Amino acid sequence: GKCVGLDLVSTKLLAEKLNCDYVHMGNTGSSNERMFKNIYEWIENNNETGHYEKPLFIIGLSGTARWMFRSQHKKKYFDLQPAHVQNYDDEALEKVNEKVTNWRDDVNELRKFMEYYITWIYDIEEHDLKLQRSVMMLHHYLKGNNCDYRIHNSLEDSLGDIKDKINYISFQDDNYKGEDTWKNFLMW
């Protein structure tokens, strides 16, 4: 997709409509793990101040094949998307390789690793279940910290039968019956 800019982010428009503070914590290409980490850290750093009485989080889940890693030499977190290794051209993969190895290893080794991971290690059903457990734990953590939230599938529907147990936003209605994701709803 194409970035429309931070001024047209749906959550910013919602904050303006509700006349409330807006804090943008999302990053294009982020993993679910990164989103949960950012939410957790924000709550731990802001909930004690009393500035926010009952923050509302709008969470758009990404694909389960994305995962967060901490760069040893940069001392910061990045996300890897091995399911899309075929979409990385050499230049893009070089940028990832710099984050991962600081150019100490060949970019082709990274490509082989990502292909190996997707072919032999990644199991979509298992990762969907892992995401569902994480969402349920996030649900209880947010409730326990007086936070409200709404969650939806941005890219793929991995939530299975937990949707009725959480504050889930569905895009399906009488007219739209496709995959219950923001991406597919927008393309409909």
Which residue ranges define each predicted feature?
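Serine-esterase "nucleophile elbow" of acetyl-processing enzymes
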Residues: G1-Y40, T49
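Alpha-helical cap/lid subdomain in secreted, periplasmic
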Residues: Y40-W188
